A protein has these predicted regions:
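Amphipathic alpha-helical transducer elements in NTP-driven molecular machines
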Residues: 9-16, 33-36, 40, 76-87, ...
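Intrinsically disordered, low-complexity regulatory segments
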Residues: 1-162, 166, 453
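Metal- or metallocofactor-binding catalytic centers and their adjacent structured scaffolds
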Residues: 232-264, 270
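Basic, low-complexity terminal or inter-domain segments flanking catalytic cores
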Residues: 2-3, 79, 90-93, 118, ...
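C-terminal or mid-to-C-terminal helical accessory/interaction module adjacent to the motor/catalytic core
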Residues: 137-219, 253-257
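Conserved short loop/turn motifs at secondary-structure junctions
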Residues: 1, 101-104, 181-183, 253-262, ...
């Protein structure tokens, strides 16, 4: 009997239906020689620093860097029951093999392997690796199960990624939070992404617009000079041309063709969904995941933009489904070969609607899912269509010794552009003229313009920058060393927003991503190794090398550890930066646990370090029972001296009042108080 473990219950149910596992039990299904169970995403996570050393519950600079000799995973309490079920199933004598049916990617591999290892299982692993949740795809996948050993490199890559994120997050967050007195959540991949945004805003702020001038003639069509810096020069040319005639110097007409874009991978689809539909990258991924589980589109977390060669015969059927989704006609000619290239497919092929999508009632889908499915369908229709062909005409004329140029465009065959949702306004067609022909000038005018600054990042353009590690004009065939992966980039952006480092700000129809003052301040104080997009991209590249078995995991982890040791030993706080991280609240003292500032809020006195749980509650029963209030001055005295006098305390036993001193007691996890008298 085989035990199949999926990543979530909904996927397990789809697999069980195909395998004939119809008998329901607590936490699993059974039948047809299979037991099908599930995780709830990550059932286990890397343990907190205090699990390795209780002293590390308190944040101190002296304890850094924290680098465990071996890492431990712990099961989340709310997921313990399902873990216990999986462990029990793995230990059944009837179970001979365990099938990893978690998400076919790095994180799915880690989810399964962590549970497998924590359960102490040593039974053979088989791997289900599919790109569609359709019944036929599941059935075919089980007929071609692969050895789990084939994915040991993927597991090691995932494990190294998790450990590296833990090490950088724990150490850098504590180090810079303690150094600058405010919680600064720092991530291995978050910080360089934030650096891209901060750098762009700096470029915009430093930009000084410069005016420029052109002269435009109306000679039956508009003809224009190049840009000029001096208005006087432009005025002189315009005046010289008024009432004159132009001579046609050259007419160049070239027929050109533009090949269809490749199919969508996750990043390119997220970019178009943001640009065209206004969806965030996380929304698009969520919609795609829902469509995948509904068997309406293929696996979303892919970095490939082609189908495999053996799928060429299925392309016409997929195109029919895509046309049905869009309510559009199929291309007159389907060029299947141009979307198939096994050499350009990594773990999963491009995102396309499935055959099942042809029969779906589009009105029954939520709006977001419906629009994203249509976008993916248009991507397929576009990719298999013929090139867009057009004729470009360039006319050069001379007037008063000055050259003027006019450009026009005529569409010959629309080709793949018939499926574009956004129709770009084409250059107007030009009249037919011949060389040496003379034309009269009806008007000559000076046009004024200004150079424009770089544009703020949107999710569309930030995703492109992350994919290329901030490098512009990267060739399509270049090996990309990007920040994060297609599967993680949307989460990185969302975490930057939720952490208060980035905000979304709408401008007309566009939503820009802008660094907050805190985000800008963080990049100001971070050293190069924590904010370099290129270095982070190189780390991601090395994780891929681990996956391929080209380098040892230990060499990668040693590099991370060495970087953290160097950071702690050599980083010098930047003087004057205390003004960069103001909380806006009045400081009453220093936190006895982590040393950060304690400020007053309506309900109490809180440590500014968000990762520290220290708080003195104003409504504490200790004070209200004595008919006293924890005032700001009392809290300040307790934080400074550990004790403070308290007069006129009410006794619930006697009904009388008395004077005493209150002691602050804190064990690193809980805060308490104790009354002492002058004689005791």
């Amino acid at each position: 009997m085989r035990l199949v473990i999926a990543e979530k219950p909904s996927v397990a149910q789809s697999i069980a239906a195909v395998l004939g596992a119809k008998s329901r039990h607590d936490g699993y299904l059974e039948g047809g020689g299979y037991i099908v169970s599930w995780c709830f995403g990550h059932l286990a996570e890397l343990a907190d620093a205090a699990v390795y050393n209780a002293d590390d519950a308190k944040w101190t600079l002296a304890a850094l860097p924290i680098i465990p000799t071996s890492f431990r995973f712990i099961v989340r309490s709310e997921k313990q029951k399902q873990f216990d079920i999986l462990r029990k199933l793995m230990r059944w004598e009837d179970v001979a093999e365990v099938v990893n049916a978690c998400d076919a990617g790095r994180e799915g591999e880690l989810i399964f392997r962590t549970v497998y290892c924590l359960a102490g299982c040593s039974k053979p692993i088989l791997r289900l690796w599919i790109s569609s949740m359709e019944d036929d795809a599941i059935r075919s996948g089980f007929q071609q199960l692969k050895s789990g050993r084939d994915y040991d490199g993927l597991h090691q890559s995932a494990l190294c990624r998790a450990k590296a994120d833990w090490l950088v997050g724990i150490n850098a967050t504590r180090y810079f939070s303690l150094t600058y007195g405010r919680t600064l959540n720092i991530g291995r991949v978050m910080s360089p992404t934030l650096a891209l945004l901060v750098q762009r805003e700096a470029e915009i702020s430093a930009f000084a617009a410069e005016p420029f001038y052109t002269v435009q003639l109306d000679c039956g069509f508009p003809a224009t000079t190049g840009r000029m810096k001096d208005r006087k020069d432009a005025d002189a040319i315009a005046n010289a041309c008024k009432g004159k005639a132009v001579t046609v110097k050259s007419v160049e007409r070239k027929e050109k063709s533009e090949k269809a874009p490749a199919l969508y991978d996750l990043t390119s689809l997220q970019r178009d969904a943001n640009r065209i539909l206004g969806y965030t990258s996380q929304q698009t991924l969520d919609y795609l995941q829902a469509l995948y589980e509904k068997k309406l589109c293929t696996y979303p977390r892919t970095d490939s933009r082609y189908l495999t060669d053996d799928m060429e015969g299925s392309v016409p059927g997929l195109v029919s489904a895509a046309a049905a989704v869009c309510g559009m006609e199929k291309p007159p000619t389907i060029c299947a070969k141009q979307v198939c290239s096994s050499q350009k497919v990594t773990d999963h092929h491009a995102i396309v609607p499935t055959i099942s999508a042809e029969k779906v009632d589009m009105a029954s889908l939520p709006l977001g899912e419906r629009e994203v499915l249509k976008l993916a369908a248009r991507g397929l229709l576009r990719a298999v269509d013929e090139p867009h062909r057009y004729a470009e005409t360039v006319i050069t004329v001379d007037c008063a010794g000055q050259s003027f140029t006019a450009k026009g465009k005529t569409v010959l065959t629309p080709g793949w552009k018939r499926y574009e949702q956004e129709q770009v306004e084409a250059a107007p067609a030009l009249p037919v003229v011949t060389e040496n022909q003379t034309l009269s000038v009806s008007a000559a005018s000076v046009k004024t313009g200004k150079t424009t600054p770089p544009k703020h990042f949107t999710e569309n353009t930030l995703l492109a920058a992350m994919e290329n590690a901030g490098k512009e004009d990267m060739p399509d065939d270049a090996e990309r060393k990007g920040i994060g992966t297609p599967a993680t980039r949307s989460g990185i952006i969302e975490k930057l927003v939720s952490s208060g480092f980035v905000e979304r700000r709408k401008s007309k129809k566009i939503t820009n991503l802008l660094p907050t003052s805190t985000g800008t301040a963080l990049i100001t104080v971070l050293p190069e190794q924590l904010q370099s997009p290129q270095l982070t991209a190189e780390w991601e590249h090395r994780l891929k090398e681990i996956e391929r078995g080209e380098i040892a995991p230990d060499s990668f982890m040693d590099g991370i550890a060495a970087m953290l040791h160097e950071l702690v030993q050599t980083y010098k706080p930047i003087p004057g930066t205390e003004v960069l991280f103001p909380s806006g609240r009045e400081v009453v003292g220093k936190c006895p646990r982590c040393g950060a500032e304690v400020t007053e809020s309506p309900k109490g006195f809180f440590c500014e370090n968000r990762a520290c749980s220290f708080v003195l509650w104003k409504n504490s029963r200790f004070f209200t029972a004595k008919k006293k209030v924890l005032t700001k001055s009392l809290a300040a005295a307790l934080l400074k001296n550990g004790r403070a006098p308290l007069k006129g305390c009410y006794s619930e036993k006697t009904g009388k009042t008395y004077d005493a001193s209150v002691l602050l007691e804190d064990d690193g996890q809980r805060t308490g108080y104790k009354m002492v008298f002058d004689n005791g």
